[in-house]
């Protein structure tokens, strides 16, 4: 994680292949990664799918050509450590390692608030 934080803020997204709202949100996460990566944003997408579902995770990511980094947390250790409770869960961490924003679940339109939070963390004009 520290290697990402040296570049800028990090948005950690917890998702699963069985979570339809997660998949809807991933489209916006990819857009944000493409839009803000040159400003220092890193998006780490962490699947809580089981080890048995690893092939589903890989094929889903390949099929959608997402550019952000994908990790696995099949035992949900990181998910629990960051107080995840609903899917999807998003946690925005500043360069000091402090959680500055957290969002649980997905509803259409949440991407606008997410964009505001990302721009603020990146110190970009609103």
Language-model regions: role of each:
Residues 1-10:
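A short beta-strand-turn-helix
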Residues 6, 59-67, 73-119:
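Thiol/disulfide oxidoreductase modules built on the thioredoxin-like
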Residues 9, 21, 27-30, 69, ...:
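Proline-centered helix-kink/hinge sites
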Residues 11-12, 43, 90:
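Hydrophobic beta-strand anchors of alpha/beta hydrolase catalytic cores
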Residues 13-18:
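Aromatic-flanked redox-active Cys/Sec active sites in thiol-based oxidoreductases
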Residues 23-64, 74-81:
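Structural microenvironment flanking redox-active thiols in thiol-disulfide oxidoreductases
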Residues 124-126:
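Non-globular targeting/processing and membrane-anchoring segments
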């Amino acid at each position: 994680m520290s290697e990402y934080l040296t570049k800028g803020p990090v948005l950690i997204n917890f998702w699963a292949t069985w979570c339809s709202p997660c998949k809807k949100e991933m489209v916006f996460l990819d857009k944000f990664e493409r839009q803000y990566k040159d400003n220092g944003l890193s998006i780490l997408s962490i699947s809580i799918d089981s080890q048995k579902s690893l092939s589903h995770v890989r094929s889903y990511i390949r099929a959608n050509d997402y550019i952000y980094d994908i990790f696995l947390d099949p035992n949900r250790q990181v998910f629990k450590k960051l107080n995840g409770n609903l899917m999807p869960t998003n946690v925005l961490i500043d360069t000091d390692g402090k959680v500055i924003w957290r969002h649980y679940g997905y509803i259409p339109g949440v991407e606008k608030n997410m964009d505001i939070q990302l721009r603020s963390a990146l110190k970009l004009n609103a």
